Amino acid sequence: EKLPLCEGSLCEMVRAKVSRTIQEKELEELKAKGAGTEDGEPIVVDELDADEVSRLLLEVDHERADIDPYDEKILTDPNRGHWDLWCDSEADGCPVLDLSYQGYVARNPRADINRNRIVAIDFGTKSTVVVYQNEDSRILPVRVGTGNVSKSIRAEHYENPTIIEFNDIESFLEAYAATLGRPATRWDDVYISHRAVDDLQSSLSTDYSAFFSELKQWAGDAGVKKAIRIRDRQDNDYLLKAFRELTDEDLNPIELYAYYLGLYINNMRNGIFLNYYLSFPVTYEFAVREKIAESFERGIKKALPEPLLRDEEIMRNFRINGSISEPAAYAVCALQEYGFEPEGNEEVFYSVFDFGGGTTDFDFGVWRESRAPKYDYTIEHFGA
């Protein structure tokens, strides 16, 4: 069956697929017939049949971020359903694409919000670790850019390299800006983490400028004033400003890295998370911490479904908490793992030396039983 007029995030992906799969002459014929105009009228996507769109729906996050395709039952199971088929009828830009006649089920992404669950992100110089709470309150790590998640797991898979590879920046940014949330970006345009490292190790020296692995140093170094030149694999040059001088319109690798982390965290397998904890080196100035947190917020929000982003009540509960230092975060985990459980007025004094991939931090403080009923312990840390 042929599809009706189409708008919205999913349809941007359909359009992208159309432009890549039909010949230029055929596309010009479609435009001549009024199948798309410069003033924003929707394109008729009848050159793709419903089976092809079904495949796109199942592979939507594989196309975006190399995440394993969803199983077919997500489209027809009344207790599941697909986010990209859902829209709020009163919302602007609500997609017209309706596949209910195929027996497909739309799912309101609000139903998948993991309330009171948290995500913790250790944004490291060489690698980044991400963990989240599942419905059983178990803490699970996330691996990014390793390809098929069913292949054998190694511990180092969860140390996600802090690196980004630019293949086609223009194509990526065009798609990234096209919709409010879950844009029709392509993984092949920008890689991060394990995939980017694999490519770096096999690349020629002439391709090194397509890789950027100093995200954290770039953000934290107050002495970096000159612009950094990035050249993608299409030989397009981009000047990357000093981090502190970036505006919201500038290319921001930290935001793009966070966007991909957001896709791996928030999807139709894991659900949606609104509470994030981000650790920082002790020595980072408050303004830098705040700007990094803002970059993560923009990137992670971009990975969320549009109905949530348009819901002010829900988004008031979205937060990036960046108040804890990296050594203090380690102290919280280590003290509990080693069985330090102070009671009453008992206090445990600690100090931590954190020899990281690019920085060395020191923190010291006091660990005691919490007086607040919703917490077990309180840590008072002083830094150095």
What are these language model-derived features?
Residues E1, Q102-T206, F286, E290-A384:
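Oxyanion-binding/catalytic loops of NTP- or PPi-dependent enzymes
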Residues E1-R55, Y158-Y284:
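Conserved phosphate-binding loops in N-terminal lobes of ATP-dependent enzymes
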Residues C6-S9, V14, Q23-L27, K31-V44, ...:
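Nucleic acid-processing catalytic cores of prokaryotic defense/repair systems
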Residues D68, S279, G322-S325:
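N-terminal low-hydrophobic presequence detector
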Residues W83-W86, W187, W218, W367:
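A residue-identity detector for tryptophan
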Residues C87-E90, Y191, A222, R371:
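Short, isolated positions within intrinsically disordered regulatory regions of eukaryotic proteins
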Residues G93-L97, V105-R107, L251-L256, S325-A328:
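Short linear motifs at secondary-structure transitions and domain/linker junctions
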Residues G93-P95, L239-L246, R316-R319:
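Generic detector of short, locally flexible boundary/turn motifs and exposed helical patches
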